[in-house]
Amino acid sequence: MKLVIIAGPPSAGKTSLTKQIVKRFKDEIKIAFLKIDVVKAFEDIELRKEFGILTRKIYSGDLCPDHAGVMVLGDAVEWAEANSADLLIVESAGLCLRCSPYLNQGLGIIVLSSISGIHAPEKMGAMVSLADIAVITKIDLVSQAEREVMIQKIREVHTQIILMETNALQGNSLNRLYDLIRESPGIDKDNLFLKGNPPLGTCTICVGKKEIGWKHHFGVIQK
């Protein structure tokens, strides 16, 4: 089974890209889709109604959504394989810029909106620097000069990343992405690891302390 993990900030076009991928492959292979979010998500319902594919969603609750993704991904792989899926697409919440949801196997795709600002790639850290592919969306809403600057900023963060631009609603210029998915090897579910290093550790705020100020906190976070 192949694995594709799609990350990116809210409203960047992750679900629109997912729909284009599903539309392209749904008649060739069996697809499963997992959405990880915090409060509410409707993408699973949309994809199931529109394309009739297997879908699930997970709410992270009190966990960071990307930490929750690490916890549930093993079960998701088992679920997809048990349903004879050929491709599992995981769409992250994209809310934790310090974390990277990508694994040592499969394809990691970062979706960036061209209208998010030219400094967005630099601010997103590991979500960009550890991705295999960057898809820049909403290119019809900016000038050619702005697009070139965005590409340059992404290259400064990750020199080897595979770049492509699209209007994800229409799905133009994505043939290379489809080829990369088609050519990607299947995963070995017993040897899946995070590609990057996780954050330093759990701080007192993570475990529920609400007091304001350094004097109330201790451990890995120090002044």
Placement of each model-derived feature along the sequence:
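Structural beta-sheet core signal
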Residues: 33, 110, 134-136
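Canonical P-loop GTPase G-domain recognition
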Residues: 133, 140-195
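Nucleotide-state-sensitive switch-loop elements of NTP-binding domains
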Residues: 2-104, 139, 172
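Short, surface-exposed amphipathic charged segments that create phosphate/polyanion-binding patches used
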Residues: 69-74, 172-185, 204-209
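Short, glycine/polar-rich helix-capping loops at beta-to-alpha or helix-loop-helix junctions
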Residues: 41-45, 119-124, 146-153
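Short, charged, surface-exposed secondary-structure boundary motifs
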Residues: 65-69, 117-125
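P-loop NTP-binding site
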Residues: 1-16, 21-25, 184, 188-223
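Inter-motif core of Ras-like GTPase G domains
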Residues: 94-116, 125-132
